[in-house]
Amino acid sequence: MLTYVRTSLFDSPAQTLVNTVNLVGVMGKGIALEFKQRYPAMFKAYKSLCDRNEFEIGKLHLWRSQAHWVLNFPTKTTWKKPSKISYIEDGLKVFAASYRDMGITSISFPPLGCGNGNLDWAEVRPIMEQYLSKLEIPVYVHDRQVTKGFIPEHKEVSFERIPVSFEDFLQDIREQMHAHSGTFATLKGRTLFGAKWHDDGGILIESPGRASQIHPEYIEWAWSALQSGIVSADQFPGDDSRKAKSYLFAILAELPYVRVTEIRKPEWSENTPAHGLYIKREDRNADMNSVDVPHDPGNQLCLSL
């Protein structure tokens, strides 16, 4: 279940984030430096592994904290040398064979070996698709190559909580509908429509020339999908639900903790990206102020074939 996403890796709803690293214990630039700053205990464990010469190409280092997991994926031998396609493939082979054993339930990758690694994304992408597209967990690749300007600008709004129950979620939707006086605009095309609650728990939609309904089960599907990652149109079974999706997405996008992103599936045309929604979890950013904790060997794994 591979999806390309245009968001920061650190905004991902995935359980595990992939950090591209070298074998000499240095995280001095790019995404690795940001990982080091956000997860100092992870960096300490990784550096210790490198100092003992126990890390190599084709090995993966999984570091687990209570909130987030980080998978250190070696794409370079040293920061002084570029990446190689063979390094990427060696690591992906290990990941595809061992992600279940590691307990990984969802994961976000950057374009492996690109950027500071100097690899061409046109060469890396098919390798990543080969190993990741058929895995049985949500896999997100934060691909900055996707067409820019597709997503309407979304205001950053602070929020005090994320709902823990479907009932709280419904109440938040009701409050947003009241705040907007029942008037919203679709994400694509910005077409205005009206929305009001139906007695059965669904939402009645009034748009130019037609009326329709978002059934209660569609809202439940969206809630369930948001708990596990990014919700997209292809998760809505049937034509009726997909038509209702464009209205439901517009309403949900107004919730202060929901973010809109551009997504694309490997099987889609390059020119047909779509919208996805995910919950912005503020605790990703809280790690910027985290404090080192004593090293616990039980919090990490180092695997190879």
Model-derived features: where do they sit?
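Macrodomain-like recognition of ADP-ribose-binding/processing modules
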Residues: M1-F249, A253-L305
